[in-house]
Amino acid sequence: MGEPTALAERALEQVPDLDAAIDELATPSRVLSRVARPRPRPQEGPLESMMDVAAGGASAPPADPERVLEDGRRAAMKVRASADPQHVTLTLDEQVGLEAVILLFGRPALLVQHGTFPTPPAGWEALDAERPRIEHSIRSVGRIELLNRGMVGTGFLVAPDLVMTNRHVAEVFSLPADGGGWTFKLGRTPVIDYIDERDAITSATYKITAVAGIHTDVRIDLALLRVEANPIGVVPAGWTTPAVLPVSGTPPVIGDGEHHVYVVGYPATDNQGVTPPDVMMRIFGDVYEVKRLQPGTMTAISATLPRFSHDCSTLGGNSGSCVVDLQTHQVIGLHFSGGYRESNYAVALWKLADDPLLRDAGVQFV
């Protein structure tokens, strides 16, 4: 098998009791609603090819989840037991099942409900240990949408009246104004809702009043939006405006091992058809545009550009999401690009600590 089984070995290496972990996690509902596609490092492409096999094309009959997971259990045990995992021989069914098992222990995309997240999959117990601080971050991330038009992206609070998002998100509803600055397009009324969770019956919506600035450097996909201090409409009982997220003004301290981060955002369905429909359904359970916690690792920091890459599970709709350091819970990045068969990229915000646009707008670096 070569690289696919090597990737599987790496994905499963943090799971000491593999058989028990599969028994605990491998139910169809959990596969669909609690985990998402793992994001391999840029040079590790075989997992995507395995997913193509699993998708099976538009005419493929739906797979039996129990059979797929049993095939995956058998394949995972073969990989675990082999002295040479890269040369393990697997049947086609075992290859498909192995991908499903990897998803259980790979990069999850956990649904946020009532401001918190479910028990994470095996290998991500660190999220539970950091739960209170992660929940604090979750509250300050919202879904940017247009009244009567739907979602356009994600944003997060970086000052009491300031939301950060991507340039390409802001440009959906704004355009350059005569004499400088930016103005809203006719008929576009942007707002941000800090809840928008699955099955939520309440909202916490704030009007976006102005574009404070859009970065002129084409390498920096960043925009800043002014928001009103008080919500519009009815909010949940006891609701208070979310806290400002601390933005790191210094580089993350990278040790010898993986450097864990997490994204909070609103992944949306792939309307461009890049991701096979069967893959989207199997991984996300047809649940999109709601708040999710998406942990992963930093994979590279550019030496020449103000950006870094990460392997959190993201889709369209995550544009404008914060990338938070799991050690410090400070925002280190602004996610701006990524998806099926792509690397994930974020603006390295610590490199902009002295940037005039961010400084003058009031971004609070720490």
Feature roles, as predicted:
Residues 2-28, 37, 41, 300-308, ...:
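C-terminal subregion of chymotrypsin/trypsin-like serine protease catalytic domains
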